[in-house]
């Protein structure tokens, strides 16, 4: 996928794995050997060897009694989870630097919200610096304690209570208290933050109440199965001491390239942000939750450097030179034809195609239906009939992909969605019905003397091969397509400000569909949200209400299918193609679980899940000097999770 924007409720990292990638030795032609596995320290794989709450309540305020969540709190009558499996690999070791690239420097690092904050980099940084009350296990989807040790859900499913971990601390050393949760909710509701999607979500709650220093209560003002999911798993907890002076408006003004203190395992200092060039994310040595079971084997790299490389082809060359540690392969040509050079053949670079249950995103050309003639569905359908997906998949993409017909994917896809095929004749018929049948001297279609011109925004040159073919298809029928290459930052600004005709977009998938923030009519004419096409439909609005109130997963699935059908038949996107795998190439110097990513993860798992393997690193350095050394290349296609089916709902919390 090209562009990537995410409105997610979760950023889950890590996975359970018994061992790390192969422990054998491969003899080279000289008779010497190079180890292709091993690494990491000897550690127990038994989850019971790692406490859920080490040094429980040791940091509690002695003035707070047990019944108010202080030291000696028993948890009677509360829910918790002390039996979850390990997420990370216990043998992982700390240290080292992971060098990654981003195609453009973001317009803001306001990871908490606000205009133009919904970027892939911000989405990655947020859960590394900030934590929520609870988190989901990425394999079982069970709730796990995070900032809260225990929780309660009322019988009517409207009121939630959380007991905070008295040991939790912000990066500035301040303890996490109930007032921090209250202030964090109020901050997200501040209209000065200019974040309508967040306010749509958090307006479903009344103002939380701090019952004590460590117990907070919140009541939903409407029944919604996702409310517990959002409040416990999405709300980043911030220091109330700072929020007393920093409201939404001040945050937008002063925190474009500065982060508030968080409770997470990493920190981004002001000096780590080099505008236009790089962002360095640093591991904290004083992270309060480092010894908890949920973090065993995770958060291993001392530094994660995000370097700006504005050309993806250049990034590929930098990776081959060893200037970047891995490369997420978006281009099939690179995967099939170009990842076969000597360093790959010798095993110095490993390539993997990883199949798992990560949520399917949406990729396509988005129409701005607020503008003519894109408000006419006949014109939108016509342009969709001019994209020859089958030919492109075969000729350009080596049959690596399949045409996409849905906005949700998996079991949520409506099987009756239109399968729009390449059909220039039908395209011309639809254009004629819409009044585009006359032609000017240049052969262009005209209506009322105006030619049919369209500008398409894109930001990755890797898209140009198929876009130029599409441009030629449109020219043949009399449509002028202007391909406008812009930076990722500029494109994001133009799309969020609704200043476009067509835009080449890629959206990450959500574990639990949240159609409201992409398709609700109330967001259609408001900037800075994911309803970029201006979609409005009263039936969809009704279904969104029904979806929120439905606690039966099977019935929710049917609702999403109906929404999917309505949206697909509105043709607000020219949907492109999809793949059920992730392709990655990496230098053979890392330790990682056998699964590589989590069951529902992708390459963004690497910073938290993988680790520096000093033995491999030393052998790789030697092999780069000695061309006779080789390593096992391993299995390219891996299916560590088999076919586990469509993820359902959390085991606890939504009932």
Give short role names for the model-derived ranges.
Residues 121, 149-194, 217-219, 309, ...:
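Aromatic- and charge-enriched surface segment that lines or borders ligand/interaction sites
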Residues 62-86, 95-155, 186, 261:
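N-terminal lobe/hinge region of extracytoplasmic solute-binding protein
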Residues 99, 177-184, 213-219, 225, ...:
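Alpha-helical secondary-structure segments
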Residues 165, 254-255, 287-340, 471, ...:
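Ligand-site clamp/hinge motif
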Residues 23-28, 188, 208, 269-280, ...:
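Extracellular/periplasmic solute-recognition and catalytic clefts
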Residues 93, 198-247, 254-256, 265-272:
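Surface-exposed binding/hinge segments that line
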Residues 24-42, 81, 272, 276-279, ...:
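Detector for C-terminal structural segments
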Residues 119, 124-142, 234-298, 303, ...:
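Gly/Pro-rich hinge or "lid" segments in bacterial periplasmic/extracellular proteins
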């Amino acid at each position: 996928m090209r562009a990537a924007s995410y409105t997610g409720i979760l950023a889950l990292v890590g996975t359970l794995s018994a061992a790390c990638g192969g422990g054998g030795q491969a003899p080279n032609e000289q008779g010497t050997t190079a180890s292709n596995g091993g690494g990491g320290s000897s550690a127990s794989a038994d989850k019971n060897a790692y406490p859920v709450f080490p040094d429980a309540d040791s940091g509690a305020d002695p003035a707070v009694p047990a019944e108010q969540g202080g030291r000696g709190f028993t948890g009677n009558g509360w829910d918790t989870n002390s039996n979850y499996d390990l997420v990370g690999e216990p043998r992982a070791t700390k240290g080292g630097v992971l060098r990654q690239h981003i195609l453009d420097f973001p317009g803001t690092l306001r990871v908490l919200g606000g205009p133009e904050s919904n970027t892939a980099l911000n989405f990655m940084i947020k859960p590394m610096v900030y934590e929520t009350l609870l988190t989901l296990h990425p394999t079982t989807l069970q709730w796990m304690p995070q900032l809260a040790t225990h929780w309660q859900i009322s019988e009517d499913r409207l009121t939630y209570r959380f007991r905070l971990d008295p040991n939790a601390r912000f990066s500035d050393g301040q303890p996490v208290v109930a007032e921090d949760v209250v202030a964090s909710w109020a901050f997200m509701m501040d209209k000065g933050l200019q974040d309508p999607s967040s306010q749509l979500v958090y307006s479903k709650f009344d103002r939380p109440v701090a019952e004590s220093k460590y117990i907070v209560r919140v009541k939903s003002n409407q029944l919604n199965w996702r409310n517990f999911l959002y409040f416990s798993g999405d709300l980043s907890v911030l220091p109330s001491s700072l929020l007393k002076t920093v409201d939404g408006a001040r945050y937008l003004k002063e925190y474009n390239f500065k982060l508030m203190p968080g409770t997470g395992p990493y920190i981004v200092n002001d000096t780590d942000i080099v505008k236009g060039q790089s962002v360095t994310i640093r591991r904290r040595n004083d992270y309060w939750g480092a010894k908890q079971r949920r973090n065993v084997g995770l958060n291993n790299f001392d530094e994660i450097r995000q370097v700006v490389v504005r050309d993806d082809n250049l990034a590929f060359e930098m990776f081959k030179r060893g200037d970047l540690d891995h490369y997420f392969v978006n281009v099939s040509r690179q995967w099939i034809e170009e990842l076969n050079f000597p360093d790959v053949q010798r095993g110095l670079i490993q390539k993997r195609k990883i199949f798992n249950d990560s949520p399917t995103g949406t990729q396509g050309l988005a129409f701005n239906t607020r503008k003519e003639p894109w408000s006419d569905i006949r014109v939108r359908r016509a342009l969709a009939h001019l994209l020859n997906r089958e030919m492109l998949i075969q000729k350009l993409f080596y049959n690596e992909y399949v045409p996409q017909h849905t906005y949700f994917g998996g079991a949520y896809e409506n099987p009756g969605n239109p399968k729009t095929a390449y059909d220039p004749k039908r395209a011309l018929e639809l254009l004629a019905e819409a009044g585009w049948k006359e032609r000017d001297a240049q052969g262009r279609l005209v209506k009322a003397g105006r030619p049919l011109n369209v500008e398409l925004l894109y930001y990755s040159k890797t898209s140009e091969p198929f876009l130029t073919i599409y441009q030629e298809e449109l020219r043949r029928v009399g449509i002028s397509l202007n391909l406008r290459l812009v930076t990722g930052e500029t494109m994001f600004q133009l799309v969020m400000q609704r200043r476009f005709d067509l835009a080449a977009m890629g959206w990450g998938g959500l574990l639990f569909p949240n159609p409201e923030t992409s398709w609700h009519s109330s967001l259609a004419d408001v900037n800075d949200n994911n309803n970029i096409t201006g979609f409005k439909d009263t039936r969809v609005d009704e279904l969104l209400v029904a979806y929120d109130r439905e606690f039966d997963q099977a019935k929710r699935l049917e609702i999403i299918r109906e929404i999917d059908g309505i949206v697909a038949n509105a043709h607000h996107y020219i949907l492109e193609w999809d793949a059920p795998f992730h392709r990655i190439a990496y230098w053979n110097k890392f330790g990682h679980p056998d699964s590589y990513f989590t069951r529902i993860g992708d390459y963004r798992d690497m910073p938290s899940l993988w680790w520096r393997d000093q033995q491999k690193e030393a052998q790789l350095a030697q092999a780069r000097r000695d061309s006779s050394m080789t390593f096992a290349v391993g299995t390219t296609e891996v299916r560590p999770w088999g076919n586990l089916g469509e993820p359902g709902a959390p085991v606890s919390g939504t009932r």
